Curated annotation (Swiss-Prot):
Cystine residue pairs: none
Ranges of Polar residues composition bias in the record: 539-555
Organism per entry: Debaryomyces hansenii (strain ATCC 36239 / CBS 767 / BCRC 21394 / JCM 1990 / NBRC 0083 / IGC 2968)
One of the record's GO cellular component terms: cytosol
CDD domains tied to this protein: PX_SNX41_42 (cd06867)
Protein family (similarity comment): Belongs to the sorting nexin family.
List of residues binding a 1,2-diacyl-sn-glycero-3-phospho-(1D-myo-inositol-3-phosphate): R164, S166, K190, R254
Gene3D superfamilies: Phox-like domain
Pfam families: PX (PF00787)
Protein name: Sorting nexin-41
UniProt record, GO biological process: autophagy; protein transport; retrograde transport, endosome to Golgi
PROSITE patterns according to UniProt: PX
Domain spans labelled PX: 123-288
Role according to the record: May be required for cytoplasm to vacuole transport (Cvt) and pexophagy.
Gene that encodes the chain: SNX41
Length: 670
């Protein structure tokens, strides 16, 4: 489908038999070529200056100078720089403009070699450090992440580069524009506590219950840990909103998720073969310049680009209508407000309808799709949202942290009782008389019980740390995919809307052309009648012809004025059209020009219709294929996450049982 569509649509785009060429930097001149030209030109200038100063030099010296220049050119061509010239003879004879244009890129960088489809590589972020490189104020620093591209077959073969968080953001934004149908992996959000106040208003009951158990904690305040009730919000999942995490833990969290992002991109063939992605991993590439260059080659909107590959967009896509209306609200805070409204409605219905909320929540999840999908696709479409794993995880983590605080308080209380009892007169007198009654050992029993809660606090703190990194973190990453799927679905809906707008546009243009052709036919008939009558009646016929022409023009105006009551019609356009009709000195010529322009426009729009049919078919097939494979993979990931969660709970429970059994034996010995 993709090859056939591309051959029809992008006729100006070259086709490749072996593999797809995604290089966004064609016909660029290399750095070594510029250096070679600069050196040779400098050498020739020095030689000319020497000839002027020394007129008595013989041809032998001139030949030596030429040989030296030739050797310098050979050294440049045989260097290990990234770009080399294919035409060495031209370098030896001196570069000119034609030679400069004939330079081609014929190298394979280490990054490109490691990113071959059959290579076994992985990426990891080894460290994150502060840097002030490029900052005007050197006292201000930013975090830089060190990326390692490692060959698993040869661990010594590795490439290391350093990128900022904003570089990861720009990479993902460009990938979304190039491949709007591919599920681009998420990256960790930069701002962790976005709209926490609004989330507190919606989730006040949960946050209130968690605050009561965490106000006395030394480092485990979880009021924001339970403020978000929707797993689809990518910036508010449980792990990153835990306020007890310090900056270092958050940086480590971001390192892990950014490593997952890069490795997930490696698993996508379209991204892995993209030269732009290789530039991101190349330490010699200036990423700011690369972003500027690639952005200039992409359309301004993804709705005017080739859905298969934005870098192969044909110029005819610019004639498509814009499916995004001017009245649409595109604000960053609108989506969280809508999601919080849904949750508030759900809670209200639960109170009013005695927990019967399925009917009210079903319309929100059952999003109507313009394309008929398979039943399995619709069933698994919102698997992450319907499971509510992130909501349950927030509550469980809040309970665990509250339980840890309770263990701390209980351990302190029992230890205090033990100290109080040990200083009581009854215990002191029993010790003095060597009395072994049970009352004399009560302080020891309280001390052992206090040790139970102290050790239980240690085990549950270990459990919380493991769940944060091994359960909450991958679960939060999985939650972010729901927003990505919604973005792709919105793209599909708007492309279908774009197709309908295109059909309406073609219909209106054809109707307008038909009216103009009728007017032109009537005008030609009147002109023929005028030429057929005697000259004596010319004045009368002229007046009648003028009236008839005015009637034709008035009919055209009435045809154009049929849209005046439409709400989307711009009043300024009507006024402009009215003024144009008044000052037009040659309406016949204007009408002919409009007919020619409309015929060309209709021809272009009909070509766009053919493109849209192919694009809609391709989009439907790709979404069905990508979503099906994604959900299969995602269900496997969630299954592994739950298995890991189960293992942590079992291990924690066993440790608690061992603690109680051990203390029980010690108490029995007393």
């Amino acid at each position: 489908m993709s090859k056939g569509k591309e051959s029809k649509v992008g006729s100006s785009t070259p086709s490749f038999d072996d593999e797809e060429d995604n290089n966004p930097f064609p016909h660029m001149q290399g750095l070594a070529s510029l250096m070679s030209e600069h050196r040779i030109s400098n050498g020739s200038n020095i030689q000319d200056k020497g000839d002027k100063d020394n007129n008595n030099n013989n041809n032998y010296n001139n030949n030596n100078n030429n040989n030296n220049n030739n050797n310098n050119g050979d050294d440049d061509d045989d260097s290990i720089l990234l770009y080399n010239s294919n035409n060495q003879n031209d370098s030896k004879s001196g570069l000119n403009k034609d030679t400069f244009k004939s330079i081609q890129i014929n190298y394979e960088s280490r990054v490109t070699r490691l990113l071959r489809p059959n290579s076994n590589v992985r990426m990891q972020i080894t460290k994150a450090g502060n840097s002030n490189e490029g900052m005007i104020n050197t006292s201000k620093t930013y975090i830089v992440y060190s990326i390692q591209l490692i060959n698993n077959d040869d661990p010594s073969d590795e490439i290391q580069t350093r990128r900022r968080y904003s570089d990861f953001e720009s990479l993902r934004d460009v990938l979304k524009k190039i491949f709007p149908l591919i599920i681009i992996p998420p990256i960790p959000p930069k701002n962790y506590f976005k709209f926490s106040m609004l989330n507190d208003l919606v989730s006040g009951n949960i946050s209130q219950s968690s605050n009561t158990s965490s106000n006395n904690s030394t480092g485990a305040n979880t009021s924001t840990n339970t403020t978000n009730g929707l797993g689809s919000n990518s910036t508010n999942y449980s792990y990153i909103n835990s306020t007890h995490l310090n900056k270092n833990k958050l940086i480590e969290h971001r390192k892990r998720l950014l490593s997952n992002f890069l490795n997930n991109c490696l698993a996508i063939p379209q991204i892995r073969n993209l030269e732009f992605f290789a530039k991101f991993l190349d330490p010699n590439a200036n990423w700011t310049d690369e972003i500027t260059l690639i952005s200039s080659q992409l359309p301004k909107s993804i709705y005017f680009s080739n859905p298969e590959n934005g870098l192969k967009t044909d110029s005819i896509y610019a004639n498509l209508p814009n499916p995004v209306g001017n009245h649409s609200i595109n604000m960053s805070f609108w989506k969280p407000l809508q999601e919080n409204k849904k949750k508030l409605t759900k809670k209200t219905n639960k109170i009013l309808n005695n927990g019967n909320t399925e009917a009210s929540s079903q319309p929100s999840t059952g999003t109507t799709s313009p394309v008929n999908h398979s039943p399995d696709f619709i069933k698994n479409k919102y698997i992450i949202d319907n499971s509510c794993l992130d909501d349950i995880n927030k509550k469980i983590m809040a309970n665990f942290i509250g339980l840890a605080n309770d263990y701390t308080e209980l351990g302190t209380i029992f230890n205090s009782f033990s100290l109080i009892l040990s200083d009581s007169p009854m215990i002191r007198s029993a010790k003095a008389k060597n009395n072994h009654e049970e009352d004399s050992k009560l302080n020891l029993i309280f001390d052992k019980i206090g040790q139970i809660f102290d050790r239980s606090y240690i085990t549950i703190s270990t459990l919380i740390a493991d769940l944060e990194t091994k359960f909450s973190e991958p679960l939060g990453e999985a939650v972010q995919y729901s927003t990505i799927l919604q973005f792709i679905e919105k793209f599909e809906r708007r492309k279908v809307r774009q197709k309908r707008l295109l059909e309406d546009d073609v219909k209106d243009k054809k109707q307008e052309l038909e009216e103009l052709l009728k007017a032109e036919e009537g005008s030609s008939k009147i002109e023929n009648v005028m030429h057929a009558q005697p000259i004596s009646k010319h004045s009368g016929l002229n007046s009648r012809g003028t009236n008839s022409t005015q009637n034709v023009n008035s009919s055209i105006k009435s045809t154009n004025s049929k849209y005046k009551y439409l709400p989307n019609m711009n009043s300024f356009k009507k006024i402009t059209q009215y003024v144009t009709d008044i000052i037009d000195q040659n309406p016949e010529q204007t009408r002919k020009q409009k007919i020619t322009s409309l015929q060309e426009k209709i021809g272009t729009l009909e070509k766009c219709q053919g493109i849209m049919l192919q694009d809609i078919s391709y989009i439907t097939d790709e979404i069905n294929k990508n979503f099906k494979s994604f959900h299969t993979k995602q269900l496997k990931i969630i299954y592994e996450i739950l298995l890991c969660y189960n293992g942590f709970l079992v291990e924690w429970a066993k440790k608690n049982v061992d603690i109680w059994e051990e203390i029980k034996d010690e108490v029995e010995k007393l």
